[in-house]
Amino acid sequence: MNPLIFKGNRPFDLIAVGRLCVDLNANETQRPMEETRTFTKYVGGSPANIAIGAARLGLQTGFIGKVSDDQMGRFITGYLKDNKINTDQIPIDCTGAVTGLAFTEIKSPEDCSILMYRDNVADLNLDPTEVSEDYIKQSKALLISGTALAKSPSREAVFLALEYARKHDVVVFFDVDYRPYTWQSEAETAVYYNLAAEKSDVIIGTREEFDMMEKLLNYEKSNDQVTAERWFSHHAKIVVIKHGGDGSIAYTRDGQSHRGGIFKTKVLKTFGAGDSYASAFIYGLMQGLEIPQAMRLGGASASIVISKHSCSDAMPTRAEISAFMETAEELV
């Protein structure tokens, strides 16, 4: 059963809020970053990747964020426009802030890492005054990402967007997206992530991310069922807990659980899997698919993206996912 109800007759299917950055992915693989000489530039940031993936699957998508007043900022907005994402609510920073950069290292399919430059970044300067209630109420769903909660004024902007979404019956998806380097302490992180999760209809995260959110509760041992049930006392209708190569489990308020597998593929790198999973999973739910079917779409999309060099550029179309699912081996 799909427990989500999306309001009809709205021009946007999904509006994403938060991080817009640039990924610089290593062209030379099987070596450490110290020996990498060239990188390829892509648009990055978890909410950006999810929005791009959703748009490529056919959802009418918009974005609320902030970019730097330079070539990198223009590269980001231009790419979003090229992918049919509305950029009317992406103001340009005027304080001299820069675009966040993510350098990736691909030593092997199992050994990948990301070096982030996140000081004085434009996306964290998004101000609450730049969040339009009228824009949000035109959407069926809102996607928020945890990284945008790391600092003010972006933090307050996200919470205002959440309030507008709740006011206008906009379904809220929360992609936990925990990046420790943007936070001051584990306690600060847990507090704000929990506050955002309490207002969300669908929460998507890894087991490790949910463990972080439960730090202050002093649980002796993490348990997926207990984790999910905690959020059902708030707004959550679906809680998805991802376990990497072991697939994912989706829990619903009516007590059901659904296990999603993965599809066998030739892995190039590990990053991008979560964003591609989320974009296709959200798409499936918004198309009225049952949760297991939406999870299969997410798993297939993730397998496609981790077999390719980029994240945003690699986001598949619906036809590409269907073709992949027809031939790939599903591991449940």
Swiss-Prot record:
Keyword tags: ATP-binding, Kinase, Nucleotide-binding, Transferase
Top EC class for this record: transferase
Catalytically driven reaction(s): 5-dehydro-2-deoxy-D-gluconate + ATP = 6-phospho-5-dehydro-2-deoxy-D-gluconate + ADP + H(+)
PROSITE patterns on file: PFKB_KINASES_2 (PS00584)
Example GO biological process: inositol catabolic process
Enzyme nomenclature, EC number: 2.7.1.92
Protein name: 5-dehydro-2-deoxygluconokinase
Native organism: Bacillus thuringiensis subsp. konkukian (strain 97-27)
